[in-house]
Amino acid sequence: MDVRRKVAAIGPNFDPDILEATRALYVPLIGKPSGPVKVTADVAYGSDARQKLDVYQPAALSDRVLVYIPGGGFVGGDKNSDGVFYVNLGNYFAGHGILTIVANYRLAPAHPWPAGSQDVGSVIAWTRANAKSFGGNPDRIILFGQSAGATHSAGYLFDTSFQPSGQPGVAAGILMSGPYSFQGELRPNLKAYLGSDQMKYAERSPLTHVSKNRTPLLLSVAEYDPAFLAVPTYELARAVTLRDGKSPKLAYFAGHNHVSTVMSFGTAQDDVGSAVREFVASVA
């Protein structure tokens, strides 16, 4: 596929220009959903303007609910920034019969740690309370975060202080290409969220809390994730393996960069989509 060659030419790098270049590659490739989808947009789950979510409802009842928390470098990102991304994700999974929720959350620097993971908790609480009214099963929620969204999702999954009664209220988690441990001098966007006190970074790292929760996980990394975004997934996989005595499910997406994974939903390049659907279907 020509898009694979173009992504490979970009290489293991990521910055705003690469984000836009990858977006331009995938916009023309997005197709229509494979089944009828009803969209309910901008549902409030909190009082802040950013605390909104979109619901993508399949035609039939859904035994599983996918909740997606997008990336954006802690200071940006949106559930529907341009009418394409991440509408493509909602349409793709709902078109395959999975009730899907795509949520925004509060951003740094106005809303530093722990706002992201707190908002994930609020999204999950809203989903548990409302899934049935959209034809979904609140007992089979799969939380899916990518990049900064994976950090916020991991923070919620592992740190019981963000969970009602110390339980995450989800059946499984998908963590894609996120940073999970922080130390030393951070990039400006990370510092905007985590603050400047390096003594607090360990406690604010999801990896620190991994022993507190055993929710089934799918971890993933892209071939062209830069090292600072790829290594944390392997560190998390190591910690989960030591905790459980066995490896978590770990996906390696060849030919993808940091964002082409989630931009490929709804295109003919279905490797990431089929892997996520297979994991969702496996959730008991």
Protein language model regions, located:
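N-terminal cap/lid segment of alpha/beta-hydrolase-fold proteins
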Residues: 8-61
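Short beta-strand/loop motif that positions the catalytic acidic residue
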Residues: 213, 219-221
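Conserved alpha/beta-hydrolase "acid-adjacent" motif
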Residues: 226-235
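Short beta-strand element of the alpha/beta-hydrolase
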Residues: 63-73
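Mobile cap/lid helix-loop segments that gate and shape the active-site cleft of serine hydrolases
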Residues: 28-35, 178-209, 215
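Catalytic nucleophile-loop/oxyanion-hole region of alpha/beta-hydrolase
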Residues: 79-89, 96, 101-138, 267
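Primarily recognizes the serine-hydrolase "nucleophile elbow" in alpha/beta-hydrolase
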Residues: 122-189, 201-202
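C-terminal catalytic histidine-bearing segment of alpha/beta-hydrolase fold enzymes
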Residues: 220, 234, 242-284
